[in-house]
Structures are given as C-alpha cells and as structure tokens.
C-alpha cells in the first residue's frame, strides 16, 4: 500500500531549561594603582552566539566586570575587565538549524582581593533557553486505493512569534549631577513599557535606568540614580497581532564633562526588535482506521509551542539593611546597587508570580572617614497579569537601588524593579505519522457479528465506535440518529456488523 502524506507547518518545542555556567578570572588594576580594598563589583553578561548542532547546543558569550576599589590612602578608583566564556549542553533531539533563544542573568558574583592586588572573581551565569523547530512535520493524509479509510483530526490553534521590525538607534542624553568629576562605575538598564501603532508607524516608549557611583573633585563618593525616558518611532511590517518590543543596550558609556559643567554624558546604542503574533488553525490527524484493511497507527509525539505576547510590570519596595557585626557604624551611606535574580516563576489562573532575590551592595563612610561596603540579599515577590493560555515565560529583570537614609547600624534602601515578560504555551499532541498492516487491528469484542447493541463510553464519537467494530462511522450515525456526539457513558448504540 502507498501512504499519502501532508506536511504540517507547526512550531515544535524541542527543549526548554536553565543552564548554569561558572565563569572565573582575575582583573588587574590599572597601571600605577594598587587596591587595598574592593568596594563594589558589578557585572553584565551577554550571549553573542547560540547555535544548535546535531545533539548539542553551543553558547558563546562574555562577562563584563567593573570593580570599584580603594588604595591604602583611601583614594578610590575603578577598573574593568571582560571575560569570554563558552558552554555546551547536549540533547539527542537537537539538530542543526533549529531555533534557539537564550536569556542570560548573573546569579552569583563573588570577588576577593588577590595577593598581587588584582581583583579575583567567580560568577555563576544562569542561561534560560528555549529550542524550537519550524521544520514541517510529515503526517498521514490517506492510503492509496483504500477508499473507506477514515481519519480523525483535531483542530490545533497556532500562534507564532514573528519579527516584524528591527532597528538600532544611537541614544544620547546629558544629565545634571552637581559636583561630579568622574564616573567610577555605573549600570544602565532598559525597559520597554509600551508599543503602539501611531500614524502608520510603531511608537516604542520606555525608560533607561542609570545607577552610577561618582567621584567629586575632593575625592568624595556620591550616587546617581536617574530614569531617562525615551520614545522612538520605528518601522514595522503589518499583518501581525499583539505587537511588543524587546530592546537591548550596547556600546554604553557614561562620562563626566567636568565639575564646571556639572553634567554627565550618556551614550548608548539601542537594539530594538519588534515582534508580533500570527495565528492560524491546522488539522492534526490523531487516529485512523479502515473497515476493509487491518492496520495499526504509528504516532509521532510532539509539543506544539505557541507565543502568547509580552507584557511589562513594575514593583517597588523599601528595606532596612543592617551592617554586619564587626564593621563600623554608618556615618554617611554613599551608594546602593542591586542585581535581581528570579528563583521561582509560576503561572496560574492568568497570574504570574515571580519570587526572587535582590543582591544588594552598600557602600558607606564611617565616622573615622574610612569607606566600608557589605552585601545583603533582599527577597521579593511580585505578581502580574498573564495570558490565560500561557504555561511559561522568559523574563528580563531590571532593578535600581538608591539610598533613602542611613545611620548607625542601618541603611534604608529603596528599590524599583522592572519586569518584562514574553509568554508561551505548550501542548502535547500525538499525530498519525504512518500505519503498519496487522491481522487483528479491527477485531472487536471477540469478533461479534450480526445485530449488536453496544454501550458507549463517555466522550466517544461515531469514529471511535466505528473503529472498535470495524464499520464506517457514517453507518453508526445513520443507525443511531437520536444519539448526540460525543456520546455519554452508557449510551446504547445499535450496529450491524
């Protein structure tokens, strides 16, 4: 017998997981400087390449470390290092050409002062990734010469994320900062808060949050926390629903223009990617039989992946952080920096709950004019609306921290947390991918023949009854015109076999 085929266009979820990569190294201070104490350490991570091969997924990226330190005289300075890394995860289902999407986040960051004055660090990077395949799936559509073959199908709604526009824009802004002479370290984070169609174009708006440790001409430390709004008009193709935008900052710089101007110059490239959702409905064959030909179905199990759109939410909190035992009291709290990490994400009843930690670093000055720093972990829980069909999400977390007060053994810190989410759903389906001839696939109830009165099971339809007894489903309907499908448990059906 010759099998007839149909190719389904469906996005399949191959694998999703979170991999942890350890990155370690040391960063020497700039020439002429020797660190006596490390005050702060911040890190940014970027995945530059993510590609599938047969049986494996390869990651390549870089970790950028910024260290703020003090020498033996108490003078402060900063230095930067970049460490490349690579990682490979193996899976027998991976194949070349599959689609992959990876989001990295620094989960753990430790630093210590090495004997040679360099800053030794170790970091754990979490890589949240999804691997999908858009290759057509071959399914059964019939058997040549078997006219009475019946195929049962289910309608499957698909929603595929498509990129409808991308653009890189150079963004520049001058910020006022009284007394700032130099920038020791800073972080810049971008959050897209709205994407809208306006006047035939796409308007994207949001905020860039800057957190900087600055130094005055007198050697004093000061903190700058600033939100810089942006609004850009971009081009995007039509024909997609529920558009949203993902943005990344690259080639970022922040520099002081001199104490006489009291200004900081911020520059960055913003990579915008606009996504939309294109929906369709496909028929997936789930079962088949023929009254005249004995065969059994062969199935291919797959997980259909659908995009559910994106959303944005904000969360604020205030915490009192205590100075560890053995350290001097706070005379002046100088700087707070926070790095967020999600420890648990769940979606239930159209609500996403995110639990996590804000890894916080505090720098302060004691009454003896010495600079100290300490770490603390602040837990958080936030909830935000999620699409009803969503099963999981990929998150981008941005956090800013600022000193709102501090003295004695306590520093008061205010946090702002931005959450950008891309939602997805997954559903398992078994499709008929072939048949194999058998001798008894259509034998039923001990090969009963004649007039039969059978009991239906709950949820069965004429196809199920027809397959069980080897008769056309249309005959089942004709003999039982008053029985509605799907049948109820115990419904009595008349058959001629």
Positions of predicted regions on the chain:
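Primarily a LysM-type cell-wall glycan-binding module
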Residues: 439-478, 483-497
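Membrane-lipid interaction segments
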Residues: 1-448
């Amino acid at each position: 017998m010759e099998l007839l085929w149909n190719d389904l266009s469906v996005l399949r979820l191959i694998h999703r997981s979170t991999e942890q990569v350890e990155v370690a190294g040391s960063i020497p201070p700039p020439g002429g400087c020797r660190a006596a104490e490390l005050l702060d350490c911040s890190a940014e991570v970027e995945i530059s390449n993510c590609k599938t091969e047969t049986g494996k997924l390869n990651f390549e990226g870089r970790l950028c470390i910024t260290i703020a330190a003090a020498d033996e005289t108490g003078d402060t300075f900063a230095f930067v290092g970049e460490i490349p890394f690579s990682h490979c995860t193996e899976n027998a289902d991976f194949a070349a050409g599959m689609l992959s999407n990876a989001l990295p986040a620094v989960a753990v960051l430790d630093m210590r002062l090495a004997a040679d004055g360099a800053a030794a660090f170790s970091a754990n990077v979490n890589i949240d990734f999804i691997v999908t395949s858009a290759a057509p799936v071959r399914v059964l559509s019939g058997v040549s010469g078997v006219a009475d073959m019946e195929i049962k199908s289910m309608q499957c709604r698909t929603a595929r994320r498509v990129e409808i526009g991308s653009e890189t824009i150079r963004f520049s802004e001058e910020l006022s900062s009284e007394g700032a002479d130099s920038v020791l370290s800073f972080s810049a984070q971008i959050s897209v808060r709205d994407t809208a169609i306006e006047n035939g174009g796409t308007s994207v708006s949001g905020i860039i949050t800057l957190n900087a440790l600055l130094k005055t001409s007198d050697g004093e430390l000061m903190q700058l926390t600033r939100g810089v709004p942006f609004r850009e008009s971009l081009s995007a193709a039509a024909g997609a629903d529920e558009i949203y935008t993902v943005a990344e900052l690259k080639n970022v710089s922040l520099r002081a223009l001199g104490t006489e101007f009291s200004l900081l110059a911020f520059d960055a490239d913003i990579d915008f990617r606009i996504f939309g959702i294109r929906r369709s409905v496909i028929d997936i064959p789930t079962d088949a039989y023929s009254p005249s030909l004995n065969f059994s179905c062969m199935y291919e199990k797959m997980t259909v992946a659908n995009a559910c759109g994106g959303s944005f939410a904000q969360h604020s909190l205030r915490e009192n952080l205590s100075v560890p035992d053995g350290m001097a009291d706070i005379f002046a709290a100088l700087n707070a920096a926070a790095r967020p990490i999600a420890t648990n994400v769940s979606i239930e009843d159209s609500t996403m709950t995110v639990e996590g930690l804000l890894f916080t670093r505090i720098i302060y000055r004691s009454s003896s004019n010495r600079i100290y720093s300490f770490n603390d972990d602040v837990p958080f829980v936030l909830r935000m609306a999620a699409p009803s069909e969503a099963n999981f999400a990929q998150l981008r977390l941005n956090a800013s921290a600022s000193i709102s007060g501090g003295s004695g053994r306590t520093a008061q810190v205010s946090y702002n947390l931005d959450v950008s989410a891309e939602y997805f759903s997954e559903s398992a389906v078994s499709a008929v991918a072939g048949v194999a001839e058998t001798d008894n696939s259509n034998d039923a109830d001990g090969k009963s023949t004649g007039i039969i009165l059978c009991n239906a099971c709950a949820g069965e339809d004429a196809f199920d009854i027809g397959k069980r007894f080897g008769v056309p489903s249309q005959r089942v309907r004709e003999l039982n015109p008053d029985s509605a499908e799907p049948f109820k448990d115990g419904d009595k059906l008349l058959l001629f076999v």
